[in-house]
Design a protein with these regions (language model features):
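Amphipathic alpha-helical "stem/stalk" segments
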Residues: 1-113
Length: 113
């Protein structure tokens, strides 16, 4: 539950609001306007959940119930920046467990509808 508590901290909630309201053309524009601190805070949190899920230390149903649609909404907002960061850093697996979490969550939701 510590992870869920972290999700509800002022720091994360404010980062989520800023990322959710960000308007940008590309990664250069995003970095110039906002920097990468907020995206990194959010992605690190969900990256950790993705690792726990991959290692079967958290259940996908629990992840869905705790973090719900926020995971998908933020992924949609952040995906282009995260992909550009991967390319720019030449790190193809940068925050890949966050993407793993999203993919597993989508499969779970599709199979439970």
């Amino acid at each position: 539950m510590k992870i869920y508590e972290r999700f509800g901290t002022r720091e994360i909630v404010e980062a989520i609001n800023r990322v959710g309201n960000a308007k940008f053309e590309n990664i250069t524009d995003y970095n110039k306007k906002y920097g990468f601190t907020d995206i990194t805070l959010i992605a690190e949190l969900f990256e950790g959940i993705g690792v726990l899920l991959e290692q079967n230390l958290i259940d996908i149903k629990m992840a869905d119930k705790l973090f719900g649609p926020t995971l998908n909404l933020l992924w949609v907002r952040m995906k282009s920046v995260l992909y550009a960061m991967r390319e720019g850093l030449n790190e193809p697996f940068f925050f890949s467990h966050y993407e793993y979490l999203i993919n597993r969550l989508n499969l779970y939701r599709e199979s439970n509808n």
